[in-house]
């Protein structure tokens, strides 16, 4: 009998511990923090990680309330929510400059011309973190800009519909790291004054940063571009990192200007990649990158040299007119003249498709 007592004691302890553990799980509940309605201040709603999908949908935030807050100049602070409906930034009021008295006719004409450009303002911070956005985000004004004066933070958020924030000016840093864009993500002619954080972000069928300007650093380490990725004619004043990034379809950096470090180490380009006429004013790193299809570096300018000898090229890259490159180190093996012509023709056809597609979308 005595030999059984320790076992019974251990069993009793195990049951008690199990009960305690079970109680702890039962006590973990969905918590919701929100700002009271009808009062000034940010539109705030935070749902804890313990909330179920049903609980998040029951506490969904309508897009209309977000647009109302932005129209009133209030900040938006949403964490762990479901956002239902479209955010159409073209609905924000247009800001016009008052024309003071006493100006010359020339000054009045210049100010009137500025007022012809539509300018919309988002005054407060916009935070939508670890959330699900079911509707679209749109700014499609063809003759105006959308200016975000505060921070924009979309960390870990899933966008189920398209995002088009083209012709936007971001005065503070933009954070979209670990976000998921299931459809298109357009930031055409954007201006990023403090840079872009997009590490480990998954982009969908089409991503466009065409002619965007980045004054601050760009960190897209480990990002996945599932579809076409356009960085044509971008200007990057600060270091840029696409280290370990994955590019699934055609990728265009043609005409880009990298004034500081451009890091493409360990990146994988599964389809055609275009770096024609790119200016690398700073260090260009491509060590251990992989180009599995055609790569076009023609007329690129490596002002501080290149490390393309450390790159895996499945096809010999095009380097006609390229400056600052060790020609003998670019690519492994060689192709016949017919193969080179075939590669050139294929790249030109893909480039023509990208241009036609871009014109169609404008």
PLM regions: where:
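N-terminal leader/targeting and pre-domain segments
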Residues: 26-344, 348
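Alpha-helical transmembrane segments
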Residues: 349-360
């Amino acid at each position: 009998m005595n030999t059984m007592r320790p076992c019974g004691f251990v069993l009793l302890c195990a049951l008690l511990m199990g009960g305690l553990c079970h109680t702890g799980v039962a006590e973990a509940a969905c918590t919701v923090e929100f700002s009271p309605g009808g009062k000034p201040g940010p539109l705030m709603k935070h749902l804890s990680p313990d909330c179920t999908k049903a609980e998040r949908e029951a506490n969904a935030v309508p897009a209309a309330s977000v647009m109302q807050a932005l129209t009133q100049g209030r900040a938006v602070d949403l964490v762990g929510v479901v956002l239902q409906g479209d955010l159409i930034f073209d609905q924000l009021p247009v800001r016009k400059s008052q024309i003071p008295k006493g100006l010359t006719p020339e000054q009045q004409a210049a100010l009137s011309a500025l007022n012809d450009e539509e300018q919309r303002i988002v005054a407060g911070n916009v935070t939508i973190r670890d959330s699900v956005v079911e509707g679209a985000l749109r700014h499609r004004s063809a003759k105006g800009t959308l200016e975000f004066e505060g921070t924009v933070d979309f960390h870990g958020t899933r966008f189920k519909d398209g995002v088009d924030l083209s012709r936007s000016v971001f005065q503070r840093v933009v954070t979209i790291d670990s976000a998921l864009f299931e459809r298109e993500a357009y930031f055409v002619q954007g201006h990023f004054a403090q840079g872009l954080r997009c590490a480990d972000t998954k982009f969908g069928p089409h991503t466009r940063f065409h002619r965007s300007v980045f004054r601050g650093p760009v960190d897209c380490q480990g990002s996945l571009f599932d579809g076409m990725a356009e960085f044509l004619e971008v200007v990057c004043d600060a270091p840029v990192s696409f280290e370990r990034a994955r590019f699934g379809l055609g990728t265009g950096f043609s005409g880009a200007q990298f004034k500081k470090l451009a890091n493409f180490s360990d990146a994988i380009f599964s389809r055609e990649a275009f770096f024609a006429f790119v200016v690398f004013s700073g260090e260009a790193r491509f060590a251990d990158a992989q180009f599995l299809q055609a790569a076009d570096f023609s007329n690129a300018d490596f002002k501080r040299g290149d490390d393309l000898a450390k790159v895996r090229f499945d096809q010999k890259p095009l380097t006609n007119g390229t400056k600052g490159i060790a020609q003998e180190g670019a690519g492994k093996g060689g192709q016949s003249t017919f193969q080179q012509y075939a590669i050139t023709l294929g790249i030109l056809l893909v480039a023509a498709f990208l241009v036609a597609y871009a014109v169609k979308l404008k």
